Curated annotation (Swiss-Prot):
This is Ribosome biogenesis protein ALB1. It is found in: Cytoplasm; Nucleus. Keywords: Cytoplasm, Nucleus, Ribosome biogenesis, Transport. Component of the nucleoplasmic and cytoplasmic pre-60S ribosomal particles. One of its GO terms (cellular component) is cytoplasm.
Amino acid sequence: MPSKNSINRPKQKVNLNRKVHQRAAKRDAMEKKGLLAPARSSGTSKSGQLKSIPLDLYKGEHSTSGALTTKTLSKKRAKKIERNLKYVEQRKLLVDLQSQSEENGGMQIDAPVVKKEKETKKGQLEKMREAISTVLEDIQSQGLSLQTGSGTTLGGQYFL
């Protein structure tokens, strides 16, 4: 069969029939999976939510239509889901604390946070760098001193 853009291309009806057939097959597959069972407008619909079979298995919400299933949950995946759920709870607590602090009128800190700095022994090179930088800062802070003498820059005095 020639391609869609060739000179002796097939009629438009052939292409449209193929697309309609593909969409119908896709729709039937979604109905078999149970994705179209509750309408999108109903409250029990999961439309727009994430679909995760391992998470459903972890929560016990995944229902099997038959007695035999290939959907299992490994220990590694179960631990990962537990860890992620713990992180979700921590984020919720953090958001709640931030909203409470905004309601109370700004930032209120319960305990002051003190950052500990490690005392490091300074080597000879670091001591020299600090000394040079302090000397340069002192020179820059003094400003530029100009000698105010009488005369021009080229030589003797200039009278009007």
